[in-house]
Every structure is written in C-alpha cells, then in structure tokens.
Amino acid sequence: GGDMLAGSIHDELIESNEGTNIDHVLDLFDQLVWTISTLADKFEKVFIPTAYGNHSRMYQQYRNKEAAHLSFDWMLYNMLERHFKSNKDTRIRFQIADGFDTYYKIYDTSYLLTHGDRLGVRGGTGIVGMLGPIARGVQKVRSEYANFGKSINYVIMGHYHQYISIKGAIVNGSLKGYDEYAMSNRFAFEIPKQALWFTHPQYGVTFQVPVVAEQGVPKKPKKEWLQWAA
C-alpha cells in the first residue's frame, strides 16, 4: 500500500532518517525477498498487488505526471518482481500499476488498492476525525470506477496510520506506530497494527482482525480473568 520508507519529502525527515532513500530501498529489498519467499514456501502461491505512497516520491513537490516512475516504492516493487522472475519462481506474481490504483478480484470480490492520499478529499474535523474524509473518498472512488464499468466491493488503503474497517473499505494500520507528527496533531494513540482478512469464495470478506505488530511488556493480571456482578 505504499510508504515503504519515510522518504525525504520534509527537511526534518532528511535530518532524522538513518541513511538515504537508496539505503532504505536496498535494506527493504533484502528483507522482502526473504519474507515473500517464506510466504511462498508456506502457501505455495503468493499474489502481491502494489500501490505507491506519498512519502516515497523522489521530489519534495507533489507530482501527478509520471508519479509512479518517480517513486522509490514503485522502484522497489519492480526490483522484487524482476528478482523472482530471474529466479524463475512462478509461485509469486506481482501486479504493479503505473497509475494511482491497482484493481483486482479474488474469487468474486473486487478490490481497489490505493495508498489513500489521492481520494479527492481533504481533512477531518471533530470527533468524526478521519472517518468522514475516508467515507467520502471511498464513495468518490467507487463512482469514478463505476463510470469505467468496474464495480468495487472494497477499497483498501493505508496513509492514515490507523487501522479502520468500515463498510466497503479497509484502512491498514501503521508499522511505525505513534510519533511526533501524530502527537503534534493530537491524533488518537494506536499501537502498530496491520490488517488481516480472509476472502471467502462465496461470501467475500468473512473475517477481519488487526494484527498487533509490537511485542509489549508482559503484564501480570491483577484480577481474575472474568468478573461479574454478584
């Protein structure tokens, strides 16, 4: 879903990053080759749809033209695809779009994967927070693709750094967790999470659960595991 690296789109990121964008791409490449190979060993077939994010762009200025070809995310995806193709590993298939979205189907359930920064909406206020913009953006995306003759059951995205599941959309959590940016904007605290769901051949998405991506400090329970009123 993009933003595989923090990037250099802000001066403070350049100052705080450990290494350069190229360093990060090379490190990610090694990590993901192992991860994808391990998944293929366990599941035999692996399909990887991709989308690039806003943090991975090569320029600080936001680009629309040739945006994919100016993205470190997109470069990383292509490096991985070429690696497995050169090793003739037919268990693994990528779908790498040149545009902002990737459309695919699993059985009869249609998905649109996008990073989330190009929903055509802005902001979020009050207690609703980001839910309002996400819901409006999902509706805009669905309407746009309906004009192309494509129906969408689920829009999948990241970008918002919080795990959210609403009707017709799944927003992935963030691996990096809470940071200075989130605190300065008073965003709700959330531990690192990733979205996991199953797609049933007949019923579509039937099971969803957030995967906690942080090993917390073990706590000794102070009370019994179950309590009820006397």
What is each stretch, according to the model?
Residues 45-54, 92-102:
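Acidic carboxylate-rich catalytic motifs and surrounding loops in phosphoryl-/glycosyl-chemistry enzymes
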Residues 202-230:
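A short C-terminal boundary segment appended to hydrolase-like catalytic domains
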Residues 34, 74, 197, 225-228:
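A residue-identity detector for tryptophan
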Residues 69-100, 106-213:
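Conserved beta-sheet core of the metallophosphoesterase superfamily
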Residues 1-80:
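Core catalytic region of metal-dependent phosphoesterases/phosphodiesterases
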